[in-house]
Amino acid sequence: MPETPRRADRPSAPRYGNRPTMKDVAARAGVGLKTVSRVVNGESGVTPETERRVQEAIDALGFRRNDSARVLRKGRTASVGLVLEDLADPFYGPLSRAVEEVARAHGALLINGSSAEDPDREQELALALCARRVDGLVIIPAGDDHRYLEPEIKAGVATVFVDRPAGGIDADCVLSDNFGGARQGVAHLVAHGHRRIGFIGDMPRIHTASERLRGYRTAMEDAGITVEDAWMSLGATDPARVRRAAEEMLSGPSPVTAVFSGNNRVTVTVIRVLAEQSRRVALVAFDDLELADLLQPGVTVVAQDAAAIGRTAADRLFRQLDGALLLPERIELPTRLIARGSGELPPAD
C-alpha cells in the first residue's frame, strides 16, 4: 500500500475565518516562502512552471498581499484622511473626489469622515485617523482650536486645512476668496439698482460665514448704504430658521428688494420663499447649485471651484509627504460671478 503522507507533509489550509498567508500559499504550491514572495512582488528568479503553481495556489486560497505590513516597514501607510464638515453638503462632493484622485495618483487610499459641524467630533475623528497611522490629513475644520494636532504634526503627519484656516497653529490652508466673492456679488446687486439688500448666512463663528458677511458690509459701505440690522441674519442653516429670516426681511417696515444668500443650503430655502412672493425679489447666491440654470429666472451665483480647492490641498499635502520644506501658506483661490437672471432683476418698488 502506498505510504500515507505524514500530517506535516500535507498541504496546509488556512483555518476558517483566517486570511490565507504566504506560508499557506507556499505549502499548497510546494515551494519556499522566498519563492512565493518573489512571485507576489513581481521579482525575477522564478521559472514559469513554478510561477504557475504559485499563482494557482494564490487563486485557490484567495490570497491577497498584505500591503499594510509592506508599507509600514517603509514607515508609511499609503493612506490619508479627509475630515469633512457635512457629508450632505453638495460643495464637498467634488472637493472629496479631487482629493481622492490626487491620493490615488500617489498610490494612497483616502479615508473619509464627517465632523457633522461638531468641533469635538472633528478632534475625535482627526485623532482616530492619526491613531491608524495615516500619512496625512486634509481637514475642513468645525472648531477654531487645533492645538490638539501639534504632537501629530511634529510626529510627521502632513496636514492641510481646507475652506477655513486652522486655529492656534500654523498650517497650510486652501480656501476661496470668501470676502472678495461676497463683495462682488453684493456690488452686482447694487449695480442693478438695489439699496435694500438682505444677507442670510451660516453661523457667525464659521470663518466662511463671517468673511462673506464682511464682504457684504464692505460692498454696502462702498455704495454709501447704511445697513439696517433687520437686513442681516446669521445662524443655523436649517430650513425653518432660514425661512423665518427671509420672511421677516421681505415683510418688515423696510422690506429688502434683493437677497444675498451665504451658501447653497441657505439658497435652497430662500428660493422656495421667493417663489411664494407676489413681487419679484432679486437673488445672488454664494455657491453654485445643481439646476440653478434651469430655474426661471436662473440663479445668479458666486461660484467656487471646489475641485480646484481639493486638488490644490491634496497636491500641497503630498509635497509635504515627499519631503519638500514648505513654510505654512494660506492659498486663496478666486471665485467667479455667473449672471443667470435672478441677480439682474431691478427693484420691484
Language-model segment annotations:
Residues 1-15, 60, 101-106, 154-161, ...:
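Bacterial carbohydrate/catabolite-sensing allosteric modules
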Residues 69, 123-126, 149, 186, ...:
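Short hydrophobic/charged patches on amphipathic alpha-helices used for structural packing
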Residues 83, 138, 258-260:
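Structural motif
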Residues 1-78, 347:
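N-terminal helix-turn-helix DNA-binding module of bacterial transcription factors
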Residues 116-119, 140-145, 264-265:
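Short beta->alpha connector loops
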Residues 63-128, 132-136, 217, 221:
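Amphipathic helical "hinge" segments at domain boundaries
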